Amino acid sequence: MSIPDTEIPVDDDGYDENGYDRPSKSQVKREMHALLDLGKQLIELSPERLRQLPLEERLYEAIRTAQRTTGREGRRRQIHFVGKLMRAAPADDIRRQLDVWENGSREETAAMHRLEGLRERLIADDEALTELLSRYPGADVQHLRAVIRAARKEAQQNAALLQGQEPQRKQYRALFQALKSLTQ
C-alpha cells in the first residue's frame, strides 16, 4: 500500500514522524478559520442561492439568522456559530458550487468563446457558413443567412460611425443567440 504524498508518514504506533498522533493546533486553527471564511461567504448569498447548496436545515437557519442580525456583537457571535456548524457541512461541495457561481464553469466559458469566434468568422467570411452547415445539417439556412447579412450590414454601419457615437449591436447579438440555440 502506497502512502499519498499529502499525508505525513505514520509509523506502526499511529504517530507521525514528529511524534504526534493528531494534527497540530495551528493546522486545526487554519482549518477552522477557512470554514469561518466560507461561512461568511455563505452569509452574503441570497436565500435562493442558499437553498441550492447541500446545507443541513440547522446550518441554513443559522445563516439566515446571521443575515437578519444587525447588531455588531450579535452578528459576530452568529458568524462564529455558523463557522462551528460548518465543521459538519460538506465544505468541498459548497466551495465547488461557489466557484461555479463566481467564475462560471470552464466548459461554459470555453463554449461561449467558441461561439464568439464562430460569429466573427461568419461575419467576415461566407466559407464559415458552409462549414457550419456541414456540422449542423438541420439548421435553418434561410434564417442564418438573414441574420448574418443583417450583422454584416450593422458592422459596416458601425465602421462608418463618427467618434463618440454609440455602435449598434442588435444584429451582432441576434447572430450569437442564433448560434447558441443551434448548438444546444
UniProtKB/Swiss-Prot annotation:
GO biological process: assembly of large subunit precursor of preribosome
A Gene Ontology cellular-component term: cytosol
Chain segments carrying region Disordered: 1-27
Family annotation (Pfam families): DarP
UniProt biased composition (Acidic residues): 8-18
Cited Gene3D superfamilies: PSPTO4464-like domains
Subcellular localization, as worded in the UniProt entry: Cytoplasm
Taxonomic superkingdom: Bacteria
One function term, GO molecular function aspect: rRNA binding
The entry's keywords: Cytoplasm, Ribosome biogenesis, RNA-binding, rRNA-binding
Main location: cytoplasm
Biological role: Member of a network of 50S ribosomal subunit biogenesis factors which assembles along the 30S-50S interface, preventing incorrect 23S rRNA structures from forming. Promotes peptidyl transferase center (PTC) maturation.
Similarity field: Belongs to the DarP family.
The protein's name in its UniProt record: Dual-action ribosomal maturation protein DarP
Classification lineage: Bacteria, Pseudomonadati, Pseudomonadota, Betaproteobacteria, Burkholderiales
